[in-house]
């Protein structure tokens, strides 16, 4: 029997300047729960992290939180996760999150979100995994970043095929459905232990 779709969501520990960000984070969580899926995320209880986790739990989904000891108090760890893993380092956090996921999805966030997105994108281009990566461009948040990335292509530092590794969308259900289809929903056996 195939396991449920497990998606690693990267997003802000803040809600951002517009309510649309939290609304879309909750839509992501509701989709995961309604599809008997599993959220893997950074284990926080605030901002978009808290919104997506709450909505997943309220909709019947599983929530796997992974948080370093040093951030437990700072990010107000979500103690009612289905599973909450307190790890030693950020590297341990990212490795466990990657291992537990069938796909990755970046919602709006700050430099931590950017770093996580770029890391799994780099791993994908290098062949460390073949899991799909989505970018939810809520309220045009990622528009300037996408323009910059196209500039990098135009200047010869990236190729179009690298851009093609990202699934970009503004509608949570459509993007999540595409990621689930592309992932094989639990069939990937990538090993992140040597990264």
Q: Positions of the model-derived regions?
A:
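Flexible, glycine/proline-enriched loop segments at strand-loop-helix junctions
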Residues: 107-108, 132-136, 163-166
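Short acidic/polar capping segments at secondary-structure boundaries
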Residues: 110-112, 126-128, 139-141, 172-173
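A cross-family phosphate/adenosyl-ligand binding-site feature
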Residues: 1-100, 139-178, 182-195
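Active-site/ligand-binding-proximal alpha/beta "capping" segment
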Residues: 92-127, 134, 185-193
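Gly/Pro- and small hydrophobic-enriched strand-loop and loop-to-helix capping segments
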Residues: 62-64, 126-139
């Amino acid at each position: 029997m195939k396991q449920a779709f497990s998606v690693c969501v990267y997003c802000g520990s803040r809600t951002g300047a517009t309510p649309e960000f939290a609304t879309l984070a909750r839509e992501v969580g509701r989709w995961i729960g309604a599809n008997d899926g599993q959220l893997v995320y950074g284990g926080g209880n605030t901002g978009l992290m808290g919104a997506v986790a709450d909505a997943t739990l309220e909709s019947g989904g599983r929530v796997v939180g992974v948080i370093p000891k040093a951030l437990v108090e700072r990010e107000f760890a979500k103690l009612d996760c289905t599973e909450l893993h307190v790890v030693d380092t950020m590297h341990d956090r990212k490795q466990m999150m990657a291992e537990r996921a069938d796909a990755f999805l970046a919602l709006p966030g700050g430099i931590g979100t950017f770093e996580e997105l770029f890391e799994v994108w780099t791993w994908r281009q290098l062949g460390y995994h073949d899991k799909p990566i989505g970018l939810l461009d809520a309220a045009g948040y990622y528009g300037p970043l996408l323009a910059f990335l196209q500039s990098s292509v135009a200047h010869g530092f990236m190729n179009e095929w690298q851009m093609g590794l990202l699934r970009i969308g503004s509608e949570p259900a459509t993007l999540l459905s595409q990621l689930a289809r592309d992932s094989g929903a639990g069939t990937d056996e990538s090993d992140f232990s040597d990264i």
